[in-house]
């Protein structure tokens, strides 16, 4: 009964707050950076369509970048953003960016795919890749996943030739028969399945290598505007819960979002996006980022990413590995959790 009363009061408080006639007159600007046609940026489109930013008192502008590197390099021009885990580490090391939540678990969708007459034989005996060539995008999350897969197959550095190229080039090479083994991330994984007849070989999930998407903030801006960060997170989490609970509507907004980004994938592929990339509600985020006396799960994940970046040279030899305690924080998730209005907002699925 007490829980029911608390929930009712929180809902009432939320309704009163969001119905405030002064809210629309006092919107606070938040500049969001993102990347187009990715699952982690779909919540931005949904929130805009639903008017949720304004409901919590935010006026947002969204700037899309073609990749993580230019996005992070331009970090002074935005306040919060969605990016990959590799640029999130680079942003922590060089631009004082803090990771405040994970967008989703992309471990199953950073993967190696095979095609051609030897595809089934390679799937049956992955060690037969020895002496072959793997095409992937170097210094990226799929590079990390591919390295973990090759190690699982018992292959050492130098057992295969790795050629680095962009994702579009890999898709073209596999579709034309000029490449048989490629490392890709979603939604490109679905494209090579459908256009090149490629088959799944291995992903980060198979090796226990977690590959998250990251929600990041400029540390100086966040320190001055903690409540704006909390409101941003509350909207994002609500959008994710809505997408998870309303598949038909989720597919429709995903299609609109991907169309704007110039990516066309089938409905089956869009369903795979949701089915293979777990997201986290507020309680799940808090569990991932809970440090206590031991490093958090998020700490361990980001340490793995940072060590990989050091290995491949994305972090310079003179750069120390960034300590997660200095840039991975649950401070703003806790603000959401402690605020009855924001917590109720974040936990809604409609």
Segments the model singles out, each with a brief description of its role:
Residues 47-50, 56, 132, 137, ...:
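Structured segments of extracytoplasmic/periplasmic soluble domains
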Residues 301-350:
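Conserved C-terminal helix/tail region of periplasmic/extracytoplasmic solute-binding proteins
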Residues 6-18:
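Hydrophobic helical h-region of N-terminal Sec-dependent signal peptides
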Residues 118, 169-267:
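Pocket-lining segment of extracytoplasmic ligand-binding domains
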Residues 25-166, 171-173, 180-186, 201-203, ...:
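Short, glycine-/small- and polar/acidic-enriched structural segments
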Residues 225-316:
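Secondary-structure end/capping motifs
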Residues 20-24:
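Sec/Tat signal peptide C-region and signal peptidase I cleavage site
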């Amino acid at each position: 009964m007490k829980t029911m009363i608390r929930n009712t009061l929180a809902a009432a408080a939320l309704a009163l707050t969001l119905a405030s006639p002064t809210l629309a007159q006092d919107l606070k600007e938040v500049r969001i950076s993102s990347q187009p046609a990715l699952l982690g940026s779909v919540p931005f489109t949904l929130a805009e369509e639903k008017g949720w930013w304004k409901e919590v008192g935010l006026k947002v502008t969204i700037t899309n970048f073609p990749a993580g590197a230019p996005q992070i390099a331009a970090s002074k021009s935005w306040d919060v953003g969605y990016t990959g885990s590799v640029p999130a580490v680079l942003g922590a090391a060089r631009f004082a960016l803090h990771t405040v939540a994970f967008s989703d678990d992309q471990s199953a969708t950073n993967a190696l795919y095979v095609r051609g007459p030897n595809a089934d034989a390679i799937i049956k005996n992955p060690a037969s890749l020895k002496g072959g060539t793997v095409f992937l995008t170097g210094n990226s999350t799929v590079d990390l996943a591919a390295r973990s897969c090759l190690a699982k197959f018992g292959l050492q550095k130098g057992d295969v030739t790795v050629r680095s190229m962009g994702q579009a080039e890999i898709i073209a090479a596999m579709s034309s028969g000029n490449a048989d083994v490629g490392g890709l991330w979603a939604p490109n994984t679905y494209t090579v399945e459908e256009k090149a007849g490629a088959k799944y070989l291995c992903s980060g999930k198979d090796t226990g290598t977690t590959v998250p998407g990251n929600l990041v903030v400029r540390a100086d801006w966040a320190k001055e505007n903690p409540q704006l960060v909390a409101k941003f997170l509350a909207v994002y989490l609500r959008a994710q819960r809505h997408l998870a609970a309303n598949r038909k509507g989720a597919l429709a907004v995903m299609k609109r979002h991907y169309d704007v980004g110039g990516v066309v994938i089938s409905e089956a592929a869009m369903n795979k996006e949701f089915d293979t990339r777990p997201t986290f509600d507020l309680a799940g985020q808090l569990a991932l980022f809970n440090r206590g006396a031991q490093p958090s799960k998020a700490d361990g994940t980001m340490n793995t990413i940072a060590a990989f970046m050091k290995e491949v040279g994305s972090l310079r030899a003179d750069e120390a590995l960034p300590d997660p305690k200095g840039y991975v924080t649950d401070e703003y998730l806790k603000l959401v959790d402690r605020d009855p209005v924001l917590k109720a907002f974040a936990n809604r699925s409609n």
